[in-house]
Amino acid sequence: QTLVVDLGQNLAGIPSVTFSSNAEGKLTLTFGEMCNETGDAERGEDGAAGTVYRANYRSAQTQVQIAMQDRQKETYTSTFFYTGFRYLSITTTADVTLSHIQGISVGLDSPETGSFTCDNEKLQRLYENTKWSQRNNFAWIASDCPQRDERLGWTGDLAVYSRTSLYQQDLYAFYAKWSRDLLDAQKEDGAYPDTVPYTITTGSGNAGWADAGIFVPYYIYEKYGDKKLLAATYSSMQAYMDYLQKKSDFAGGQIGAEATFGDWLGLQVSDATFLSALWYGADAYCMEKTAAVLQKQTDVAKYQKLHKKIQNYIYRTYEIAERLERTVEKDFSQTELCMLLQYDLLQENDREKAQQMLLASVEKNEYRLVTGFVGTGLILRSLTDAGGAQSAYRLLLSEKKPSWLYSVDQGATTIWERPDSYTEESGFSKDEMNSFDHYNNGCAMQWIYESILGIRVDLAGEQPITIAPVLPDETVALTEAAGSYHSIYGEIKVGWKMNDRNIRKEVNKSVDIRKKDNSGNGETVTEAEFTIEIPAGQTALVALPIVGFEPRKLPGGIWKFAGVLEQ
């Protein structure tokens, strides 16, 4: 006899089962993230309908076997392992009474620092899914997934997600430990590994993965302002930059780290060698900022010069100016454009061309998510910087396949590894690398904090606290949001709500206040209310998108504003 239990949440943890039996026998527990629906192998299913799907666990065929005795009641709680699962399959060889079945979540016991609520249920679910995937993978190390025969600390995942993670939890101690592991794992030639802690089955010096050693320490400083950790890793960061310099050929060859992964799992093809060069430029960009924080002026000049040298190489080798002039979307992938824009690798007169090309590409792809590991963490901010905040909203809230919300529509309770981990048309992905609990694509939550709420805390900048929410237009199904971030200065809170109806001039018919009224009777407008809380003793630069509101510095306290939204 077999019973399959849906716990309702994909979690990393252990099972606890209370049972009683009047006979000796065996109770077997088997785990799965999904269930087989039809038993059709053509849909990637590995068992009969209703059984747990196990193929994506690969060789980690996690199973618990309990020898039952003739006794009234017994509780089994695993103590020797944990795994990722939502479904628990319980098979017995003798009659048994199950009185309690529980999945006990295991994760990092670190205080949550971020919160977010909104009136879009699917976006809210995506936010909760991200928090769950972070909890499930941030335990002893920052693992990629909690279920299969891997569970490694892939650096590429952290390179794109670490900024988001720092909004969600107080992770200073966690990342301090990670930084020590990083230094321990660094190769003698200066290359950073693909995984931290390092395992002999993985490589090193690969673009987009090794670069976590440059970016993560700086991101930690952004949020905590503690130079000690940054200073402790600085010589290691320099060693990696020296490694890149030694292996780079600026005279017509390749520059940067190894082009092994490219834009991993991206549906739009990117040139992996080009991305390696862009990552090298990004590293120089970040090292310049790091050196400035540590007041190493000679190094600031050194990395400024290197950044310019890389920019010149990229322009020459990849014909950047010529390709931008053609304004053909297929000349650059979205990820390539995002990296050029975010790491200041474009000449000033080319920035707008690249931004327009990015906006056109996203629109042409009908707001589907086509970026991979590298680009997904950059796309929303890049669109917003390009004046395309509404495009960013449409991309984030798209339910087309592939998209962030497609998995939510399929009942996901965590973030999926692949855009096609499961589809209604084809079933499960045929690729065995198919986790349903991977935090990397949850990097969109950074944009929720920084743009929807408008909270930015950057202790490396001139203004540590900025509050500048970006509100959606009438095409976006979102009219209310609120949230907070508990920074080292205290808790910062932002809430906004767009009124259902507010008409500047009296009209004779009912109108949608989020659209223009062309009847001649008057103009319809949207009015919004904002509530902002700034920690006591601190000052925040506040910019609100309401008519007549000039950006201003406000002291600690609770502030309320209302007004007509800018068009």
Language model: regions and residue ranges:
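Flexible glycine/proline-enriched surface loops and loop-helix/loop-strand junctions
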Residues: 72, 141-148, 158-159, 265, ...
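Extracellular polysaccharide-recognition and catalytic grooves
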Residues: 328-433
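Non-catalytic C-terminal accessory modules of carbohydrate-active enzymes
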Residues: 39, 390-567
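Core register positions within helices of long alpha-helical scaffolds
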Residues: 216-219, 283-286, 290, 343, ...
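Hydrophobic, well-ordered secondary-structure elements that form the walls
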Residues: 226, 280, 340, 379, ...
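TPR repeat positional signature
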Residues: 217, 277, 284, 336-337, ...
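Extracellular/oxidizing-compartment recognition motifs
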Residues: 1-148, 156-157, 173-174, 194-198, ...
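Active-site acid/base region of carbohydrate-active enzymes
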Residues: 87, 95-129, 135, 142-194, ...
